[in-house]
């Protein structure tokens, strides 16, 4: 499958005429990525992650929390994301959707303050799970 002809031409025009906006957005994503990485290193040093090299998301390794979910029919990354959504109101993607059940995918497309609030809630859930376990 491929984008429609109209979408392809719109993409060409965007690439020709949106250089300043592209640079501005790239800088904003870099700032958010750096803020997320700094937060994770400071607030969740016991949880590793795959540092992004150009995407607008990162993968957080939750494999150490696997036993917190016991027997289940769904992948534990899905169980974690559902718990995070239901209890902390933060939406992330389960790594199982990308063939990486030991991870969750965190997008940093939201503004920096929203991103850091969400990461704080992830930190809180991780700490709660470790206390319960």
Please give the residue ranges for each predicted region:
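PLP-dependent class I/II
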Residues: 1-133
């Amino acid at each position: 499958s491929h984008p429609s002809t109209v979408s392809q031409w719109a993409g060409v025009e965007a690439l020709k005429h949106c250089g300043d906006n592209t640079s501005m957005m790239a800088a904003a994503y870099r700032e958010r990525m750096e803020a997320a990485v700094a937060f994770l290193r400071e607030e969740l040093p016991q949880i590793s992650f795959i540092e992004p090299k150009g995407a607008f998301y990162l993968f957080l390794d939750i494999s150490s929390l696997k036993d917190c979910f016991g027997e289940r029919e769904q992948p534990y990354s899905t169980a974690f994301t559902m718990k995070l959504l239901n209890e902390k109101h933060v939406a992330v993607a389960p790594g199982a959707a990308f063939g990486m059940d030991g991870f969750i995918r965190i997008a940093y497309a939201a503004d920096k303050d929203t991103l850091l609030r969400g990461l704080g809630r992830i930190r809180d859930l991780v700490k709660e799970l470790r206390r319960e376990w």
